[in-house]
Structure formats: C-alpha cells, structure tokens
Amino acid sequence: MKDISFSVVIPAYNASESIITTLDCLNEQSYKNFDVIIVDDKSADAQKLAEVVSSERYSGLKINLVLSETKLNGAGARNRGIDLATGDYVCFLDADDEWHKDKLQQNLSLIERLEGQGDRRFIIYSQVNIIQDGSFLKVMPLKPVGEHESIAEYLFGCYGFIQTSTIVLKREDAAEIRFDERYIRHQDYDLCIRADKLGFKFVMIAQPLANYHMVTRFGSQHKGESVKYSLFWLDAMKPHLTRRDVYTYKAYKLPLRYKMDGKSLQASLSFARYFFLTNKDNRNDFLKRLMNKLRTRLTGK
C-alpha cells in the first residue's frame, strides 16, 4: 500500500497565541507525511500569526499560510483549505485545539484497514477530551453511532458527538461535500448530516485523540448560539432531516439555547414536548445520567 499523505486544514481567527500549542502538537506527530494549510480569516493579528508560523520553531512543518483579505467565517476558511489540499486525506484542526501525538498514525492504521476491506466512502472521527475553561470536563462521545441511527439523531442526542478537530476523510470527498458557508454555527453538524444522506460510513476511534477547548465566559451570542440562529439553522436543514431528527434537536439541543438566552420555561416546555418522540437509546441515556446526578447529590459521592 502506498504511503498515505494528509493535509491538515486549520481555520484561524485572532489565533496567533492559541495556535502555538496547536502547531506544537503537529510538530510532535509520530506520522510525518502531512502538510498544514492555515487559513486566516481576516484577523486583526494576521501579521503576528505570520511571524509565529514562519518562526524556527515550526521550520520542520510544511505550512501553507493563507491570509484572507475578505471575511470567510469558519465554513469558508475550511473550504479554502480543502481547495488547497494536496494530501490523500483531509483532516480538520481548530486553531485552539490539540491532537494526541499518535493521532495521524492511528488514523492511518484505520484507513489501511478500511481500504483493505473495500470501504470507499467513510468519515473517521474519534473521542475527544473536552476542556472547559482550562479544566478537564469529560470524554465524548460516549459511544459510536448506532446501526439504525441517523447521524442527526446521534449528534443531537445525549451521547453522540463528532468534533471537527477529529474529522478525517478523503480529499475528493471533502471537495464534494464541503461546508455550507451560510452557517456561522453547526457547520460540522451540516457536513456530517449531508454525508450520512450520501451513504458515508462513520467510523469512531474509541480513544480521545484530541483536546477540544470550550470557553463559557462569553454569552451565547458570541458564536451564533442563540435560539433565533438555532431555529434558522434547523429550518434550513429540514430537507436533510427526518421528523425524528427534528424532534431530537428540539428535545436536547434547543433547550440548551433557551437556557443560554435566559428562557428557562421555554427550555422546559421544548424538552417536555419532544423528549418521548426521540429514540429509546437517547431517552435511556438521559434518564441514566439524571439518576446518576440525583444519586450524587443525595450521597455526596
């Protein structure tokens, strides 16, 4: 089998400081056949980013830095990276996340196995360590997508999660699917849902191969996480969603947006209306987690 190459696509926005640990993790990768495409999204610190990228510290990396003169947002920046990719496979990595040193090696091993058994259209993802405000929170997803479960149900429910910095797919497949540049939020949901509809197989590596950093000190508006945006996105996605997919979003995701907007009553009503219309696995997982929380509060353990 040929020596498979990867293109790592990194969208960057005011990321000249956070990208240092991101590039450090690429320096440490055990598998070396990859190039890096950084697309800066018209940042105020673009020149500082250029200085970081061109420093001796990263002289061993093959980096193509693109300084966009127009605002692209995350979807557009990733699409620009896809267009410039030359590797056999495209990997996405956010400019404030990190990979485990064997991330590419483990993906390579899985790719060789999948290709060896005749699989042609697949998307690889892995578990991630979720770091909230600098502290470890949890590992997600809890399990891979179910055999009879849509990717939308999986992503919208309680146990599923496909973080962008773990996604790996063939370059030609990335070029076919692309990110929808209308969306400032949920671009990763959209890409995965449309890939599912096209018949792509989703394969999870049951090991956290990335650190995903969440910051909660900002309000919900700062990344388009408002109820208004969520309803716009859900309506735009309806051609790709089943009725139960929509119910699952309104039971588990939309209540979180209501809470972030300070609308606790609407959150409770949305959950109550749609919870029993979601699949059994999501209902059982939610109830199990609820019981665990109650037990912890009662026992202090």
Curated annotation (Swiss-Prot):
Pfam families assigned to the protein according to its UniProt record, in alphabetical order: Glycos_transf_2
GO molecular function term, any single one: glycosyltransferase activity
Pathway entry: Glycan metabolism; exopolysaccharide biosynthesis
EC number: 2.4.-.-
GO biological process, one term: polysaccharide biosynthetic process
Function: Involved in the biosynthesis of amylovoran, which functions as a virulence factor. May function as a glycosyl transferase which transfers galactose from UDP-galactose to a lipid-linked amylovoran-subunit precursor.
Family: Belongs to the glycosyltransferase 2 family.
The protein's name: Amylovoran biosynthesis glycosyltransferase AmsB
Native species: Erwinia amylovora
